[in-house]
């Protein structure tokens, strides 16, 4: 398996244009959160025999995907695992907060997901390069690490090299 730095370097090749970088800084977080929100509404818990009814809403495609996503990040590095855990925690806090506020989270997530992907494809058109995930779907999980690295640089934080 490629190292975290190899993934980031490869991802960075098709993310050089300043417009595309801004697009990614805005849209990657939106897509990440919206994707997990959409997956939240794929119920699984109600089909699990013996699962307490109170737990059923929390057993869904998003929570079942959680160990897979964190496992991948953990294979890359501790830093990737911590960044991934932070992004997932923010995602789940927004999802649960939206549900608690009786917002139409599913519809908001669907609209954000479609709009953000449209803007992403525009960014790649400006870049003149196809999205990295067109060659390897794992790059859908590298985008958040790339964006976090860019955010850290904007904030003036030294970015350690991935191991």
Short names for language-model regions:
Residues 43-48, 78-82, 121-137:
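Juxtamembrane/interfacial segments flanking transmembrane helices
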Residues 82-87, 104-111:
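Hydrophobic alpha-helical membrane segments of integral membrane proteins
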